[in-house]
């Protein structure tokens, strides 16, 4: 129960961090966002570890677990976050989000293969829906692009596109969204491997290790003159949003690490997919002129959300809500690996 609640909190704060980062990259650069959010992580996690009295837990974590946590920091906080910021800069949070939901498939496959966790028939249905959501969105966008190229309907499409000030860069956005999904799908396995059998306090110490390694990886970038000029060119409007994003993502990662210390990947990661709905809400509140809110896009997000719920809820709970045929009950309760 506690692991699920922590995962839900991680979902909401991660969504808010994405939305505030999206606002920042309108006037700042992706590298600026990366450096600010990573370097903020070390003092935030250090302060949290001191307040919780868990700083000493760093020394108690065995070396193999430290290696897993260090790899998670490099993969998630450096590579994954860079790709995430490139994606939301190019196509916005609403279009990048459903593609990034496929990270769930990576996490679940690796959890079954490497950690010995299990899937049910209901969870497999959820996987199908999580894949279907981005497919719906891509189909809608292809139809709109075809309409824009059609002289007979070009004016109507043009009028529709003019309702938003934002013009997506689709190829760049979807490539980096897919890369971030791969990184975000692999990192929970590393975190769980490093923290399994511990407690939420040790999760904070584990997050400090991951952030410290990520900060060390990013630090040499300052020796490159062009990168240094880019980072030093950061101005207040973007700095304000990047700082907010950094604080929110630190809180998100903190409770995520705490959740993964006490709950399996197949519980924590699906619950985090509820960030789809949080992203939609926060985007409307903060970035409505810089996002895509077309009906087909919202429909794809809704399908993805239903898939995430199917992956999150216990099969027994769902079957208790509605009387279903015996064949459906048997299919929903099927388990893999292991069958019934």
Q: What label would you give each PLM region?
A:
Residues 105-125, 135-137, 141, 277-299:
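C-terminal transmembrane-helix exit sites in multi-pass transporters
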Residues 40-45, 99-113, 128, 213-217, ...:
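Alpha-helical transmembrane segments of compact multi-pass small-molecule transporters, enriched
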Residues 30-31, 93, 119, 200-203, ...:
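Membrane-helix interface/capping residues of multi-pass secondary transporters
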Residues 185, 305-312:
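Aromatic-anchored segments of alpha-helical transmembrane domains
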Residues 33-34, 96, 203-207, 268:
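Juxtamembrane helix-start motifs in multi-pass secondary transporters
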Residues 1-31, 36-71, 81-91, 139-178, ...:
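Membrane-interface interhelical linkers
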Residues 15, 46, 74-78, 104-109, ...:
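Hydrophobic/small/kink-forming positions within alpha-helical transmembrane segments
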Residues 69-73, 119-133, 202-214:
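Alpha-helical transmembrane segments
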């Amino acid at each position: 129960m506690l692991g699920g609640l922590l995962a839900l909190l991680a979902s909401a704060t991660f969504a808010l961090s994405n939305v505030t980062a999206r606002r920042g990259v309108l006037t700042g650069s992706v590298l600026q966002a990366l450096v600010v959010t990573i370097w903020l992580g070390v003092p935030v996690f250090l302060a949290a570890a001191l307040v919780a009295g868990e700083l000493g837990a760093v020394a108690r974590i065995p070396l193999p677990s430290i290696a897993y946590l260090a790899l998670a920091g490099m993969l998630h906080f450096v590579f994954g976050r860079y790709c995430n910021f490139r994606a939301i800069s190019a196509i916005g949070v609403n279009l990048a989000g459903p593609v990034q939901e496929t990270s769930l498939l990576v996490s679940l496959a690796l959890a079954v293969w490497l950690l010995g966790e299990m899937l049910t028939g209901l969870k497999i249905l959820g996987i199908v829906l999580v894949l279907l959501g981005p497919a719906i969105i891509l189909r809608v966008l292809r139809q709109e692009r075809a309409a824009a190229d059609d002289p007979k309907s070009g004016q109507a499409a043009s009028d529709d596109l003019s309702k938003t000030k934002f013009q997506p860069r689709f190829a760049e956005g979807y490539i980096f969204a897919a890369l971030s999904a791969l990184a975000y799908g692999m990192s929970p396995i590393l975190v769980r491997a490093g923290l399994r059998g511990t407690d939420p306090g040790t999760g904070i110490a584990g997050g400090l290790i991951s952030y410290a390694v990520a900060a060390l990886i990013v630090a040499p970038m300052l020796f490159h003159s062009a990168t240094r000029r880019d980072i030093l060119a950061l101005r207040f409007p973007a700095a304000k949003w990047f700082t907010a994003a950094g604080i929110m993502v630190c809180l998100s990662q903190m409770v995520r690490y705490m959740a993964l210390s006490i709950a399996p990947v197949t519980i924590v990661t699906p619950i985090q997919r509820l960030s789809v709905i949080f992203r939609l809400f926060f985007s409307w509140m903060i970035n409505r002129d810089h996002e895509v809110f077309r009906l087909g896009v919202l429909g794809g997000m809704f399908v993805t959300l239903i898939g995430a719920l199917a992956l999150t809820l216990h099969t027994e709970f769902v079957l208790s809500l509605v009387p279903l045929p015996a064949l459906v009950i048997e299919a929903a309760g099927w388990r893999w690996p292991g069958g019934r």
